[in-house]
């Protein structure tokens, strides 16, 4: 389940796109075409030190000869964004995965409403380019705290479809420049909402949409970062490895991944925050305590899979298909 297809690419260009944000243009080594992708796709990037991180593709999905990603340098980086900014340079060869898409455009739709906060513009920009090429009806709203921190702002304003895009800069008032209530009410049948950005931005958009009675099937979103949630009432529980019968106790301070590693069972991870889905594992028996932002509510309710990087157990034991 966790194995991926990888390929080698060359960093053709690295440039600053905004304050604290750089982009990488990735080309195939042999000059041939790259695996096709659709708007909303992301790739895993293998970084120095054994780190693996996910970055969305921002270029037009009809471009078969390159991938473009943009990376925000996070002040609280666990090594990923710092490695991109400090260690990767034009001319280097790196390993990436083939593209995957958990944030695809819904078709057919009467209209597409695209909302991006900060670095969340990367998959949203690819969507806008795709929709514009198809002459589809869409609006793009791009929110940021300061103009100099908004990647691709100039490119958006210079695009042939710039009339469908609005930039909302918060710096003047200190409050959000976008009136979410006015934008999302009333809900319109056939309109699909796509949102990507920091968790606070995502929560504000989705909470407003749900309060306005947007149907879940018209809401599409992708988180860029989460937090492994530890609660004061977390208790120990057991995890059994189905293939070997090994049992390990997971303490309140540990994640399931960490506990499994202590007995020599390695689960492939990437974000380690319940966002990317890399560590998705089948649950044979027991009831998970889902704390991820990857599975849908319906998938969580089924209790037949979970993300061991962040989720825990409500039952005394989980038996995992490992």
Q: Whereabouts are the PLM-identified features?
A:
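Ferredoxin-reductase
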Residues: 2-93, 110, 144-146
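A short, compositionally biased
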Residues: 38-41, 230-237, 275-277
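Short, surface-exposed secondary-structure boundary micro-motifs
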Residues: 48, 99-100, 284
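FNR/FR-type flavoprotein reductase catalytic core
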Residues: 82-243, 249
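C-terminal accessory/binding modules appended to enzymatic or scaffolding proteins
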Residues: 235-268
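Iron-sulfur (Fe-S) cluster-binding segments and ferredoxin-like electron-carrier domains
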Residues: 259-263, 268, 277-322
């Amino acid at each position: 389940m966790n194995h991926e297809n990888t390929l080698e690419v060359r960093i053709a260009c690295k440039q600053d796109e905004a304050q604290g944000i750089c982009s990488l243009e990735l080309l195939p080594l042999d000059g041939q075409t790259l695996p096709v992708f659709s708007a909303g796709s992301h790739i895993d990037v293998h970084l120095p030190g054994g780190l693996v991180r996910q970055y969305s593709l921002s270029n037009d999905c009809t471009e078969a000869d390159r991938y473009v990603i943009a990376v925000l340098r996070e002040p609280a980086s666990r090594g990923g964004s710092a490695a991109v900014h400090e260690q990767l340079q034009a001319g280097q060869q790196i390993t990436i995965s083939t593209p995957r898409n958990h944030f695809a455009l819904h078709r057919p739709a009467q209209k597409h409403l695209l909302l991006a906060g900060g670095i969340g513009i990367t998959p949203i920009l690819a969507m806008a380019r795709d929709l514009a090429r198809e002459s589809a009806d869409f609006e793009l709203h791009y929110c940021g705290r300061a103009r100099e921190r908004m990647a691709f702002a100039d490119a958006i304003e210079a695009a042939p479809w710039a009339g469908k895009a609005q930039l909302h800069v918060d710096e003047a008032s200190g409050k959000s420049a976008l009136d979410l209530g006015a934008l999302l009410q009333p809900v319109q049948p056939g309109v699909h909402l796509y949102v990507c950005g920091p968790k606070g931005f995502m929560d504000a958009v989705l909470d407003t949409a749900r309060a306005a009675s947007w149907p879940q099937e018209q809401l599409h979103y992708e988180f860029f970062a989460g937090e492994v949630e530890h609660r004061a009432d977390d208790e120990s529980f057991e995890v059994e490895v189905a293939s070997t019968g090994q049992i390990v106790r997971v303490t309140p301070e540990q994640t399931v991944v960490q506990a499994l590693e202590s007995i020599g069972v390695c689960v492939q991870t990437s974000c380690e925050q319940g966002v990317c889905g890399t560590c998705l594992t089948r649950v044979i028996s027991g009831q998970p305590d889902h704390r991820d932002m990857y599975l849908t509510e319906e998938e969580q309710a089924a209790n037949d899979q979970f993300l061991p990087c962040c989720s825990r157990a409500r039952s005394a034991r989980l038996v995992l298909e490992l």
